[in-house]
């Protein structure tokens, strides 16, 4: 069962990774699609907010493995992760 959960997490992360796109010449990342799953907080090490030039707001969560996952900044779990990361900075 743990193997299935791990495989599902990898699949979700891969799908979320494909939801970031570069905009403009300054290589700013924008979120086209947000992850539909709450990523376990223990995997998140940093975050960045997308540029105001992006079509919609987003938070790019950085995982321990260096993957970037787009998340909805209005979700409570995303706001909690950001708050916790700021406290531990």
Swiss-Prot record:
Domain of life according to the entry: Eukaryota
Localization (cell): Secreted
Major site of localization recorded for this protein: secreted
Induction line: Specifically induced in macrophages by IL4/interleukin-4, IL13/interleukin-13, and IL10/interleukin-10. Expression is inhibited by IFNG/IFN-gamma while glucocorticoids exert a slightly positive synergistic effect in combination with IL4/interleukin-4. Strongly induced in several human cell lines, including monocytic U-937 cells, by phorbol myristate acetate (PMA). Induced in PBMC by staphylococcal enterotoxins SEA and SEB.
Post-translational modification as stated in the protein's UniProt record:
The Cys-30/Cys-54 disulfide bond is required for activity.
Cysteine-cysteine disulfides? 30-54, 31-70
Instruction: Family membership, please give it.
Output: Belongs to the intercrine beta (chemokine CC) family.
Tell me a GO biological process for this protein: chemotaxis
Q: This protein is called what?
A: C-C motif chemokine 18
Q: In which tissues is it expressed?
A: Expressed at high levels in lung, lymph nodes, placenta, bone marrow, dendritic cells present in germinal centers and T-cell areas of secondary lymphoid organs and macrophages derived from peripheral blood monocytes. Not expressed by peripheral blood monocytes and a monocyte-to-macrophage differentiation is a prerequisite for expression. Expressed in synovial fluids from patients with rheumatoid and septic arthritis and in ovarian carcinoma ascitic fluid.
GO terms for cellular component = extracellular space
Reported function: Chemotactic factor that attracts lymphocytes but not monocytes or granulocytes. May be involved in B-cell migration into B-cell follicles in lymph nodes. Attracts naive T-lymphocytes toward dendritic cells and activated macrophages in lymph nodes, has chemotactic activity for naive T-cells, CD4+ and CD8+ T-cells and thus may play a role in both humoral and cell-mediated immunity responses.
């Amino acid at each position: 069962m743990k193997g299935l959960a791990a495989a599902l997490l990898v699949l979700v992360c891969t799908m979320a990774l494909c939801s970031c796109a570069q905009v403009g010449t300054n290589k700013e990342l924008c979120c086209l699609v947000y992850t539909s799953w709450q990523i376990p907080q223990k995997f998140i090490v940093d975050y960045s907010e997308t540029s105001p030039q992006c079509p919609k707001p987003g938070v790019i969560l950085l995982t321990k493995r260096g993957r970037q996952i787009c998340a909805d900044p209005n979700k409570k779990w995303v706001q909690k992760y950001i708050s916790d990361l700021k406290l531990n900075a």
